[in-house]
Amino acid sequence: MLEDTTIHNAITDKALASYFRSSGNLLEEESAVLGQAVTNLMLSGDNVNNKNIILSLIHSLETTSDILKADVIRKTLEIVLRYTADDM
């Protein structure tokens, strides 16, 4: 996976990136989930915007059978949605 700095710089929503950057270890698991979503978007050549991050997280949520991982994905999705204006 890419370094956190690269991932945060790739996110077009700077407030969202700043939130995760400043969270430290408090959101370590959620940061890892977000990082994986951003990495997947970058590797596929998609724009790293909130809409695509949300779609990626929903896909991850739908395809995981691990209840604990699903909870972390859901928390990550909730954070991204909080930072997403009505631009969807």
Swiss-Prot record:
Induction line: Induced by low temperature (23 degrees Celsius). Repressed by the autoinducer-2 (AI-2) and by indole. Induced by 5-fluorouracil. Strongly induced at 16 degrees Celsius. Expression has been shown to be independent of RpoS and dependent on RpoS, repressed by YcgE. At 16 degrees Celsius with blue light irradiation expression of this operon is absolutely dependent on YcgF for relief of YcgE repression. Part of the ycgZ-ymgA-ariR-ymgC operon, it probably also has its own promoter.
Role of this protein: Probably a connector protein for RcsB/C regulation of biofilm and acid-resistance, providing additional signal input into the two-component signaling pathway. May serve to stimulate biofilm maturation, via the Rcs phosphorelay. Regulates expression of genes involved in acid-resistance and biofilm formation, including the RcsB/C two-component system. May be a non-specific DNA-binding protein that binds genes and/or intergenic regions via a geometric recognition. Also confers resistance to H(2)O(2).
GO annotation terms (biological process): cellular response to acidic pH; response to hydrogen peroxide; single-species biofilm formation
Gene3D superfamilies, alphabetized: 1.20.5.5260
Keyword DNA-binding: yes
Keywords of this entry: DNA-binding
Species in which this protein is naturally found: Escherichia coli (strain K12)
Protein name: Probable two-component-system connector protein AriR
This protein's record includes keyword DNA-binding: yes
Assembly behavior: Homodimer.
Family: Belongs to the AriR family.
Record note on disruption phenotype: Deletion increases biofilm formation.
InterPro entries given in the database record: AriR
GO molecular function annotations of the record: DNA binding; protein homodimerization activity
Residue ranges crossing the lipid bilayer per the database entry: none
